[in-house]
Amino acid sequence: MLVIILGVIGLLASSNLVSSSTSTRVGGHLPLTFDPPENELGYWYTYVESCRFCWDCEDGVCTSRVWGNNSTSIVENDYVKYCEVSRWGDQCRYDVEEHIYYTMNCSDPKPWNPYKIAKEGVEKG
């Protein structure tokens, strides 16, 4: 009986460890945040590179947190936006400052920029 109880406790403990370790990888759970985990910055940067969490800005000059000092610096401007990102299972969601959320499959992500779409629409009209 004691062996069974210890076995159940072991299973519960290992499942808890697995779920906590997957929460920091793409595919696990990430509550809505302006500041995703450091190890996911490269993922989010690929699809919404204008997000403020991708940039270290000091005195109006911003350097990529993903590429570090090896990257080209930019002057802080309207391009650098506050973004929210979240993930539940394989559904990733992001918003570029407008509360118009874009949801995508985390394993098949697509870039989306509402500002670029609006600009293209104006040019065509």
UniProtKB/Swiss-Prot annotation:
Belongs to the asfivirus MGF 110 family. The keyword Signal applies. Glycans are attached at residues 69-70, 105. This is Protein MGF 110-7L. Keywords: Glycoprotein, Signal. Residues 1-20 form the signal peptide. It comes from the Viruses. The keyword Glycoprotein applies. Plays a role in virus cell tropism, and may be required for efficient virus replication in macrophages.
